[in-house]
Amino acid sequence: MALLQLLLFAMLAACGFSEEQTEGITIAYKVLEVYPQSRRVLITCDAPEASQPITYSLLASRGILVAKKVVHDSVPASFNINITIKSSPDLLTYSCQATSNSGTYGPSSRLQMYQELWAKPVSQLQADFVLRHGDSGPTVELSCLASSGSPPITYRLVGNGGRVLAQQRPLHGKPANFSLPLSQTTGWFQCEAENDVGVDSSARIPLPRAEARAKLVTTLAGELPLTPTCILAGSLVSIAVIASRMLSSTGL
Ligand SMILES: *[C@@H]1O[C@H](CO)[C@@H](O)[C@H](O)[C@H]1NC(C)=O
Ligand SMILES: *[C@@H]1O[C@H](CO)[C@@H](O)[C@H](O)[C@H]1NC(C)=O
């Protein structure tokens, strides 16, 4: 796994600088070195229209000044910085600013570096579900969460035949929550989680067959005692247990 990540970093680094420009100033970066707990990163700022000498400032998120450099020729300013893995990815936002006799340039667009620094494939996707009695009939409520994965994960609810029924992109570390009316689906469903560097699927969860469902609907209309519902809910729970066992035995 560590090897795979290193390979990824190497590939991304080999792709060269990613560059963005606003208001006459560009910001770009390159990962120079990967250490177990930190990354050495080269950030370059370039304001090609500014007259020399140019004073470049590298700003972190919320406008905090990280470093300043005065450049006397037409080369971009380079900042060599160490980033520890402990920092929260969303705090690692940088921008450049430049001042010279010809004026002020920037701030540049904000650079977010988490992808190359923290890229991690999706792994150990868990799908948990409960049966609820909604207004429009019985509903399966499904919660999907991968134990790791960065950049952010898009979760999809996939139904019979691979059809995507819904998708969500929750905040980092939060589960996606789907609600699936039993009347609108047949066969099975599953969760799928994907980010820029990988994809993972939960085990398929079979839905109860039509006759069991018809009984359930009648039950929920209040014409029968609640027992069949409990049996159905019970069988769904046991399916969940089996599904999660299957998951943990195939998990990475
Ligand atoms: C960055 O971190 C590495 C390893 O932690 C260290 O060897 C290197 O000297 C540091 N560089 C700077 C510029 O602080
Ligand atoms: C799903 O539910 C959990 C727990 O209630 C919550 O923390 C999470 O933010 C929800 N996800 C979405 C995408 O709303």
From Swiss-Prot:
Glycosylation sites per record: 82, 177
GO molecular function, one term: cytokine activity
Protein location: Secreted
Main subcellular localisation: secreted
Gene3D superfamilies: Immunoglobulins
Top-level taxon in the UniProt lineage: Eukaryota
Tissue: Expressed in bone marrow, spleen and lymph node.
Keywords: Adaptive immunity, Cytokine, Glycoprotein, Immunity, Secreted, Signal
Classification via SUPFAM superfamilies: Immunoglobulin
Induction section of the entry: Up-regulated in the mammary gland upon the onset of lactation. Up-regulated in peripheral blood lymphocyte B cells upon activation.
Signal keyword on record: yes
Null allele phenotype: Mice are viable and reproduce normally. Show reduced number of both peripheral lymphocyte B cells in the spleen and precursor and mature lymphocyte B cells in the bone marrow. Show smaller and fewer Peyer's patches, lower numbers of immunoglobulin/IgA-secreting B cells and an altered gut microbiome. Exhibit reduced levels of immunoglobulin/IgA in the serum, gut, feces, and lactating mammary gland.
Protein known as: Protein IL-40
Organism this protein belongs to: Mus musculus
